[in-house]
Amino acid sequence: MKKIIIAFSFTMLGVAAMGQETYDNAQLASKDLNGTARYVGMGGAMEALGADISTMSSNPAGIGLFRRSMVSGSFGFNTQSDAADIGKRKTKASFDHAGFVHTMRSGRNSYVNFGVSYTKSRNFNQILTATGRLNGASQNKLSSMKNYNDLYRLEKRNGELTSQWGTNNNPDLPYNQVDYLYSNALLNDQKSQLVGMNANGYNGGNYLGDASGVLDASGNLRAAYYNADGYDFFRGTSGYIGEYNFNISGNSRNRFYWGLTFGLYDVNYSHASEYTERLVNNAQNPIGSVTIADERTISGTGFDVKAGAIFRPIEDSPFRVGLYVHTPTWYDLKTENRTTLVSKLADGCGNGNKSTSGRYDYKFYTPWRFGGSLGYTVGKHLALGATYEYADYSYSDIRVNEGGVYDYWGNYYEESSRDQAMKGNIKNVLRGVSTVKVGAEYKPMPNLAVRFGYNYVSPMYNKNGYKDGTLNSYSTYYSSSTDYTNWNATNRVTAGAGYTYKKFSIDLAYQYSRTTGEFFPFMSYSDLDAVNGDQNKYDSGYDNFCDGQKVSNKHHQLILTLGYRF
């Protein structure tokens, strides 16, 4: 069949988020505001004030301000106020923090301190739902148009359709698991009501429209697909990233404080989603629905190094300045999925249900993170803090594991190479993020404190970013979903209180976090762009545009910390 070969034929007309693809990995790169109740209550703006175990994971020099050893633990509850009722618990208990600091005097006014801590740096618990109209667009049409534009060619092997080179070491990488399901369960009908097909249906060629006999505006046999008039989507995610920190810090003459933290990370992510489209046939009559049910996990480990300093520029002033830097977190990850197409179509439409699964090992590296902070105290009654932090997520990196080699001495080294196509997508989708934190603590009595804080986190996603299913990438090949959301800025408001009695302390904090975004079930496609603007070849029937739906993520957290100084 004579085809137009198009390297990149999809244009996103709207904005859009959500395992090895850019949007999924972006969840691993960011961190929540979490830790001790004192730290959370002040909005985390303690990177210059220090003397809190949670600063071990932000500005390690904060541990250098301890004068007595301390142990503490934090637990609480999280709830999502805007979650739909889909049979999952909206409120969950959480163990958020545990830490220990040991102080050692090294001189008259100097200390060397050691600390260890655990913090749940990322909580993935979320329920996301969306419903919208499609006005003729559909997910299966996207799969068909990728085939039509030679992003993958089909052939039948062992009784099922696969990409033409899908059984050797050179598969058509844009051919993902969703394309496989639609090719085998829906688009290869022998007696079909597909748009673009005649009564003979698919005849086993490289393209899903091979038996149509109808030419399109480009002079090719028409692509075959079902249109849809609407969709329903839900996804429940769960899991966490646990951060384990090991710190050494100290101070010199109570004026300069330094710290170094080595961090280990434990990733546990899972989601279950269902995406349902209501389909119509070539006569635009309803024929039922199809559902893509997807279950995916991401697990693995990572590590980073953090360094920081705090100094008092004026000897007789309590004013402090804090500076810190975090290396990338180097993750070694594994993702697994099982995905099923469930057909509830009328008789004679489609070929029933179909399932697929996959596993993929890869590496993901987050960007460098830089921060600066100011702190000021008024006697023993008032503490004020402000922090600015920056990380450019477009510099995140994804790498494909390629096995390993043994050196002369028998040591094994794993080799990997950059996923260049997905790296380019990261550059287009993600952006630099600024985080601003301010907080205050007031003590009306020596043993009683009240705290308030606020955070602003700028958007991570470019407003024109999209999940590109056409990339020549293993991340695309193993992908099992097409949806994505472009989340906007995050706002957090915090409050808390603390009480000390002799060597014991108890602190309570509340946090409200709100983020809005725009959800898209799949990327949009323009046939006019595919034919380079040639109106004579343009076929409006091939356009596959979907509008975004506004979504939100509103979380409430209550956290309690018990501490003991000795």
Tell me the role of every PLM-derived stretch.
Residues 1-23, 562, 566:
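Bacterial Sec-dependent N-terminal signal peptides
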Residues 9, 66, 270:
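Active-site-proximal flexible loops/turns
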Residues 11-12, 68, 389:
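Hydrophobic alpha-helical membrane-insertion segments
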Residues 20-33, 96, 103-566:
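Outer-membrane beta-barrel porins/channels
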Residues 30-48:
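N-terminal targeting signals for Sec/Tat export/insertion, comprising classic cleavable signal peptides
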Residues 37, 49-58, 63-135, 239-242:
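Outer-membrane beta-barrel translocator/receptor signature
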Residues 43, 47-54, 248:
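Long, acidic, intrinsically disordered low-complexity segments
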